[in-house]
UniProtKB/Swiss-Prot annotation:
Annotated EC: 3.6.1.66
Gene3D superfamilies, per the entry: 3.90.950.10
Protein name in UniProt: dITP/XTP pyrophosphatase
NCBIfam families: RdgB/HAM1 family non-canonical purine NTP pyrophosphatase (TIGR00042)
GO MF entry, a single one: ITP diphosphatase activity
Pfam families tied to this protein: Ham1p_like
Positions of substrate binding: 9-14, 71, 153-156, 176, 181-182
Species of origin: Aromatoleum aromaticum (strain DSM 19018 / LMG 30748 / EbN1) (Azoarcus sp. (strain EbN1))
Catalytic activity: XTP + H2O = XMP + diphosphate + H(+); dITP + H2O = dIMP + diphosphate + H(+); ITP + H2O = IMP + diphosphate + H(+)
Keywords: Hydrolase, Magnesium, Metal-binding, Nucleotide metabolism, Nucleotide-binding
Subunit structure: Homodimer.
Top-rank lineage group of the source organism: Bacteria
Length: 198
């Protein structure tokens, strides 16, 4: 029997990533848009609080278990910014192009280009689940001076992986899922799900 799980996101590319990662467990991922669920507020100062709030919101409005992630780019020279504000770094409406341009602008003249992506994934079996499953992952790299690559989304075109000589936006989806912060968080979550199923 296939388990159904609501993804608390309207990001189509994130939905594809999550579906690919959860399919081996026989879990059908449904986007929250299938239930006309609006995006949850993300007012919290930490990734874990935002991920949990989004998962609880989707579970409450769908009546199904829900999974959410909150991810962001943390740049050393910017004191960890954009961090939890990564999607809205350049303000509303959200725009990957404007966020990337602002990041390049803020790092102009900085020799320290170190950065990492961080992801927290939260899964709740119901809206009031007292024992949510929470997992996280990191992905380290550096920030380029100009974007490269057409795959991925967000800051992927600027996020350079020195050991591969490529940006995240130059990787194919399978390799990205193997290496990425979200992939690492999902692998940790999958390990937990194997002992504490839906």
């Amino acid at each position: 029997m296939t388990a159904r799980l609501v993804l608390a996101s309207n990001n189509a590319k994130k939905a594809v990533e999550m579906t690919t990662l959860l399919a081996p467990l026989g879990i059908e991922v449904l986007p929250q848009s299938a239930f006309d669920i609006p995006e949850a507020d993300e007012p919290h100062p930490t990734f874990v609080e935002n991920a949990l709030a989004k998962a609880r919101h989707a579970a409450a409005l769908s009546g199904l278990p829900a999974v959410a992630d909150d991810s962001g780019l943390c740049v050393a020279a910017l004191g960890g910014a954009p961090g939890v504000q990564s999607a809205r770094f350049a303000g509303e409406p959200k725009s990957d192009a404007r966020n990337n341009a602002l990041l390049v602008e803020r790092l102009a003249g900085s020799a320290d280009r170190r950065a990492f992506f961080y992801s927290v994934v939260a899964l709740v079996r119901h809206a009031d689940d007292p024992r949510p499953l929470i997992a996280d992952g990191e992905w380290h790299g550096t920030i380029l001076y100009a974007p490269r690559g057409a795959n991925g989304f967000g800051y992927d075109p600027l996020f350079f992986l020195p050991e591969l000589g490529q940006t995240a936006a130059e990787l194919d989806a399978q390799l990205k899922n193997t290496l990425s912060h979200r992939g690492a968080a999902m692998r940790h979550l999958l390990a937990r799900l194997s002992t504490a199923p839906l």
